[in-house]
């Protein structure tokens, strides 16, 4: 199993995928369609030579999700609202399809929310993202692809996520979950149980 979990992308993404075609899952940012970070995220992948196959889970049936994942070299789960993302994954059943394919060897790249959902829980980011955006989501269990609970943007340099919020997150959830604080520009490369921190 291979994961590249980023706070906001990383120069090693194309190397990690080892191919060209990537299923791009944008659902976490569906309420931010015109936000600059959304376009910047897509451009970051394209600049590394990756071809993006758009895969919006909220209006793609499971058979089409499966077909797309079978035709690409990797899957990229974009950033945005973590709780909304998990709600979409869970309500569509695509969480099970993606988890199965990644466990079978499909490379998984997460960015921010996409990295958080790969872990054991998304509860630990509830001070950063609002659970209220996903009122029907009652279970915060993540995809369970790693035991680490990623906390993105941990340098506190983004106004939306000041260092005080990061510190409160560690105080509130640090004893309950194995937190991994990532700054923008950092990534976790996880392969067959081995974890490497990339700067």
Curated annotation (Swiss-Prot):
- Gene3D superfamilies in the cross-refs: 3.40.50.880
Q: Which SUPFAM superfamilies match?
A: Class I glutamine amidotransferase-like
Which keywords accompany this UniProt record?
A: Hydrolase, Protease, Serine protease
Give the E.C. number(s): 3.4.21.-
Instruction: Give any GO molecular function from the UniProt entry.
Output: serine-type peptidase activity
Question: Catalytic site residues?
Answer: 112 (charge relay system), 153 (charge relay system)
Report whether Amino-acid biosynthesis shows up as a keyword of the record. no
Q: Name one GO biological process term.
A: proteolysis
- Family membership: Belongs to the peptidase S51 family.
Q: What is this protein called?
A: Uncharacterized peptidase DR_1070
Which organism encodes this protein?
Answer: Deinococcus radiodurans (strain ATCC 13939 / DSM 20539 / JCM 16871 / CCUG 27074 / LMG 4051 / NBRC 15346 / NCIMB 9279 / VKM B-1422 / R1)
